[in-house]
Amino acid sequence: MSRIGKKPIPVPEKVAVTLDGLLVTVKGPKGELTRTLPEGVTIDQTDGLIIVSADSEKRKSRERHGLSRTLVANMIEGVNNGYSKQLEIVGVGSRAQVKGKTLVVSAGYSHPVEVIPPEGITFKVENNTNVLVSGIDKELVGNEAAKIRAIRPPEPYKGKGIKYLGERILRKAGKSGKK
C-alpha cells in the first residue's frame, strides 16, 4: 500500500469536489479543474475528506494509488491558493517583458523569443529580470516555467541564462593556461 496514497485529503470549506467515477471536478475561489484519474483506483468522499484507494494489490494499481491521491490534492490546493514559479534572467542585455498576455524574452539571440501562455496561465515581470509564472494547475505552471527556462538554460562557466529563483548552478573552472 502506498504511504502517500493512504492519507486522506482534507477538503477546505471554500472548495467543492464532484466525483463521477474516475472523473474528478474541483471548484474553488480561483477557478475549476477537471481530471480523469488512471484506472485501478477508487475515490470516495466522506464528511470533508477524500479517500483514494487501490482496487487490487496488483502492481499497476499500487503504482497509481499514490499518484492519484497527489493529483487530487494538487487540484484542491490549486483552486484554493494557486501555484507559481519564479524565474530569474542572468546576463548582460537579457531581459523579459509582457506584451498583452505574451511574454517576450530577449536572451542573447538575434531575435526576441515570444512565449504565448496556455489558458489559465499568467506571466508577470518584475524589474525586467524576474518572471513569475502563475496559475491553478500545478503541472501546467511547471511545464510553462520549464519551457521558458529552456529558451536559454544557465551555462556552467559564468551562470548566465534563465534559471529558477534559488536554483544553484554548478560552476566549472575555465581553461587553465599553458605552463
From Swiss-Prot:
Alphabetized UniProt keyword annotations: Ribonucleoprotein, Ribosomal protein, RNA-binding, rRNA-binding
Q: Which InterPro entries match?
A: Ribosomal_uL6-like (IPR000702), Ribosomal_uL6-like_a/b-dom_sf (IPR036789), Ribosomal_uL6_a/b-dom (IPR020040), Ribosomal_uL6_bac-type (IPR019906), Ribosomal_uL6_CS (IPR002358)
Which biological process annotations from GO are given for this protein? cytoplasmic translation
Q: Which GO terms describe its molecular function?
A: rRNA binding; structural constituent of ribosome
GO cellular component terms? cytosolic large ribosomal subunit
Coiled coil ranges (UniProt) are: none
Among Gene3D superfamilies, the record links this protein to:
Ribosomal protein L6, alpha-beta domain (3.90.930.12)
Source domain of life: Bacteria
Question: What family does the Swiss-Prot or TrEMBL record give for this protein?
Answer: Belongs to the universal ribosomal protein uL6 family.
Describe the task this protein carries out.
This protein binds to the 23S rRNA, and is important in its secondary structure. It is located near the subunit interface in the base of the L7/L12 stalk, and near the tRNA binding site of the peptidyltransferase center.
**Subunit details for this protein?**
Part of the 50S ribosomal subunit.
What this protein is called in its record is Large ribosomal subunit protein uL6
Recall the taxonomic lineage recorded for the source organism.
Bacteria, Bacillati, Cyanobacteriota, Cyanophyceae, Synechococcales
